[in-house]
Amino acid sequence: MTAYIQRSQCISTSLLVVLTTLVSCQIPRDRLSNIGVIVDEGKSLKIAGSHESRYIVLSLVPGVDLENGCGTAQVIQYKSLLNRLLIPLRDALDLQEALITVTNDTTQNAGVPQSRFFGAVIGTIALGVATSAQITAGIALAEAREAKRDIALIKESMTKTHKSIELLQNAVGEQILALKTLQDFVNDEIKPAISELGCETAALRLGIKLTQHYSGLLTAFGSNFGTIGEKSLTLQALSSLYSANITEIMTTIRTGQSNIYDVIYTEQIKGTVIDVDLERYMVTLSVKIPILSEVPGVLIHKASSISYNIDGEEWYVTVPSHILSRASFLGGADITDCVESRLTYICPRDPAQLIPDSQQKCILGDTTRCPVTKVVDSLIPKFAFVNGGVVANCIASTCTCGTGRRPISQDRSKGVVFLTHDNCGLIGVNGVELYANRRGHDATWGVQNLTVGPAIAIRPIDISLNLADATNFLQDSKAELEKARKILSEVGRWYNSRETVITIIVVMVVILVVIIVIVIVLYRLKRSMLMGNPDDRIPRDTYTLEPKIRHMYTNGGFDAMAEKR
């Protein structure tokens, strides 16, 4: 069965190596380097999800029950040193507990806890609103109260025992390590020395040892004793945590050897002081050890660019600072919250980000899709290390080779020049001289005529200067706009002026008066005509609607006709 498990592990490891190699090979690093894009070999990705908890109870003063009070004065002096170290820490913990309350739903029956609701409610008394730091501190207090009963039992047992190390487990299986680092020295050396060397000499040896222990205590836990916040534990503190044997971490933490190396290298094991007991001179630390999970088949590459030349012009390719490659995915990686070890990136979540399609195709080797910008200043990098050598743009830079500082002439048909230990031992770029790695090799394979994508503008924008320019432009535009409005009000808008309106009113009044005068004149003229020609004096030839036969009767017409007859 054991052989089968080992065989399965070997097969899975081989498949992981093959998959990682395939993922790495999908990025043509040699082709990209010809246009100044430098991509490293990449590191694996691990997600730091949950964590394991440990508690360290440090007994800082050994149990000295020597004859005739031998060594008592030295212990009192040692305690005064500890008071200066621990009293500010105790006061800060008291203040934190006064500001933050943690309500636990706990009922007890005959001293036995029946139920526990871990960190149910975290509120504030003095501050009103809980900040993220207060919530973190509240959770730490909740955890401390959960383990308080177990830690109290250990403290009690430590005062009654003369053992230097006690390793127990609490009710939830978390380890509590009790350390009495000076007890072995007292038991093995001080007590026998009293009968051989006398009390005074033994007391002096004890005083020297206490001073040395205080110095070692500050070395191992100095950063943790200086604050009530989380601080990384040193290797010395980890050795104390694991019985002075750092390799025992591999057997006590449920993780692999590479994960242990990563958390130690990146200082991700955190310790927080949660209790200070000045009566017994004991300090309790809560230790968080992250559990890492590796994401298979994923590599995070660090990418950068230097300028390159095409037809005598200097260009620059824009690429994301980090590239995440997966079997069927290629994108960017946001490593803001990640920590980097020698072999991996440790992130609290998946850092993958989408990038434009043109950048994806560019990173995959299609240089015609690479977004580029024209270089107009000297701030763009001109060289970089790659494969143990140097890749440099020697058209835009002054490059020398060898101890004789021989100038390097770059072919204008090539974007960059590759300098290694084989063709140039001492490399100089713009006055900076460096030696190439002897194991480096020439990376000029695949050099060919290159074409790149359309130019884009990526020059950084000074927002303050641009805002000032925009404000000045708006002020000038406002003045010009007022001038334009004034001109427009004078051109084509004559009927809106006050003088024009008054003139129109006067003309209309004059016209109205003339019309009235004409009507009156006509009326008087007609009336005078009627008064000068009454109806009985109308001449015969005057046109009238009355028949002329009426005039014949009235004017004696018939009488004249009768006489003629």
Swiss-Prot record:
Q: Name one GO biological process term.
A: symbiont entry into host cell
Q: GO cellular component terms?
A: host cell plasma membrane; membrane; viral envelope; virion membrane
Region annotated Fusion peptide sits at 117-141
Where it sits in the cell: the answer is: Virion membrane; Host cell membrane
Q: Could you name the domain of life of the organism this protein comes from?
A: Viruses
Positions marked as site (Cleavage): 116-117
PTM info: In natural infection, inactive F0 is matured into F1 and F2 outside the cell by one or more trypsin-like, arginine-specific endoprotease secreted by the bronchial epithelial cells. One identified protease that may be involved in this process is tryptase Clara. Unlike most paramyxoviruses, Sendai F0 processing occurs on the cell surface and induces a conformational change in the protein that unmasks the fusion peptide. F0 maturation is a primary determinant for organ tropism and pathogenicity. N-glycosylated; glycans consist of a mixture of high mannose-type oligosaccharides and of complex-type oligosaccharides. Glycosylation at Asn-245 is essential for membrane localization and F0 cleavage.
Q: Where is this region: Leucine-zipper?
A: 269-307
Entry coiled-coil feature ranges = 142-170, 466-491
Q: Which UniProt keywords apply?
A: Coiled coil, Disulfide bond, Fusion of virus membrane with host cell membrane, Fusion of virus membrane with host membrane, Glycoprotein, Host cell membrane, Host membrane, Membrane, Signal, Transmembrane, Transmembrane helix, Viral envelope protein, Viral penetration into host cytoplasm, Virion, Virus entry into host cell
List, alphabetically, the InterPro entries matched.
Answer: Fusion_F0_Paramyxovir
Instruction: Tell me which parts of the chain lie in the Extracellular compartment.
Output: 26-500
Q: Which residues cross the membrane?
A: 501-521
Q: Report the SS bond pairs.
A: 70-199, 338-347, 362-370, 394-399, 401-424
Going by the UniProt annotation, this protein carries glycans at: 104, 245, 449
Alphabetical list of Gene3D superfamilies matching this protein: 1.10.287.2480, Head and neck region of the ectodomain of NDV fusion glycoprotein (2.60.40.1690), Newcastle disease virus like domain (2.40.490.10)
* Keyword Signal among UniProt keywords: yes
Membrane topology recorded in Swiss-Prot or TrEMBL: Single-pass type I membrane protein; Single-pass membrane protein
The keyword Ribosomal protein is assigned to this record: no
Family assignment from sequence similarity: Belongs to the paramyxoviruses fusion glycoprotein family.
| Additional observations | Sendai virus or recombinant F protein are widely used in cellular biology to fuse cells.
Job of this protein: Class I viral fusion protein. Under the current model, the protein has at least 3 conformational states: pre-fusion native state, pre-hairpin intermediate state, and post-fusion hairpin state. During viral and plasma cell membrane fusion, the heptad repeat (HR) regions assume a trimer-of-hairpins structure, positioning the fusion peptide in close proximity to the C-terminal region of the ectodomain. The formation of this structure appears to drive apposition and subsequent fusion of viral and plasma cell membranes.
UniProt free text on domains: The cytoplasmic region mediates the interaction with HN and M proteins.
Record-given protein name: Fusion glycoprotein F0
* Organism expressing this protein natively: Sendai virus (strain Fushimi) (SeV)
Taxonomically, what lineage is the organism?
Answer: Viruses, Riboviria, Orthornavirae, Negarnaviricota, Haploviricotina
Q: What gene name does this entry carry?
A: F
